[in-house]
Curated annotation (Swiss-Prot):
<protein>
    <recommendedName>
        <fullName>Kappa-4-bungarotoxin</fullName>
    </recommendedName>
</protein>
<dbReference type="InterPro" id="IPR045860">
    <property type="entry name" value="Snake_toxin-like_sf"/>
</dbReference>
<comment type="function">
    <text>Postsynaptic neurotoxin that binds and inhibits neuronal nicotinic acetylcholine receptors (nAChR) with high affinity (IC(50)&lt;100 nM). Is a selective, and slowly reversible antagonist of alpha-3/CHRNA3-containing and some alpha-4/CHRNA4-containing AChRs.</text>
</comment>
<dbReference type="GO" id="GO:0005576">
    <property type="term" value="C:extracellular region"/>
</dbReference>
<feature type="disulfide bond">
    <location>
        <begin position="24"/>
        <end position="42"/>
    </location>
</feature>
<keyword id="KW-0872">Ion channel impairing toxin</keyword>
<comment type="similarity">
    <text>Belongs to the three-finger toxin family. Long-chain subfamily. Kappa-neurotoxin sub-subfamily.</text>
</comment>
<feature type="disulfide bond">
    <location>
        <begin position="48"/>
        <end position="52"/>
    </location>
</feature>
<keyword id="KW-1015">Disulfide bond</keyword>
<feature type="disulfide bond">
    <location>
        <begin position="80"/>
        <end position="85"/>
    </location>
</feature>
<dbReference type="InterPro" id="IPR018354">
    <property type="entry name" value="Snake_toxin_con_site"/>
</dbReference>
<keyword id="KW-0629">Postsynaptic neurotoxin</keyword>
<feature type="disulfide bond">
    <location>
        <begin position="67"/>
        <end position="79"/>
    </location>
</feature>
<dbReference type="InterPro" id="IPR003571">
    <property type="entry name" value="Snake_3FTx"/>
</dbReference>
<feature type="disulfide bond">
    <location>
        <begin position="35"/>
        <end position="63"/>
    </location>
</feature>
<comment type="subunit">
    <text>Homo- and heterodimer; non-covalently linked.</text>
</comment>
<keyword id="KW-0528">Neurotoxin</keyword>
Length: 87
């Protein structure tokens, strides 16, 4: 009986994905998205182009496997590891 119970527990664990998945914002007005497996970092990139002074920086939010490298056209870059931390 103990063997059967242990087998059922093991099968349940194998069949269910017990891995935690991160949720991040993709825009301020939409609900959070579940990040793909392996992408556990939420990011916010604010970058400038030739129209930056008129309309402001372009904001990109989402999930990433690693924190992107800061580039010269970024105004800011935020990488965080809690759910919906990229607001």
């Amino acid at each position: 009986m103990k063997t059967l119970l242990l087998t059922l527990v093991v099968v349940t664990i194998v069949c269910l994905d017990l891995g935690y998945t991160r949720t991040c914002l993709i825009s301020p007005s939409s609900p959070p998205q579940t990040c793909p497996k392996g992408e556990d970092i939420c990011i916010v990139k604010a970058r400038c182009d030739e129209w930056c002074l008129r309309r402001g920086p372009l904001i990109e939010r989402g999930c990433a496997a690693t924190c992107p490298e800061f580039r010269s056209n970024y105004r800011s870059l935020l990488c965080c590891t809690t759910d919906n931390c990229n607001h």
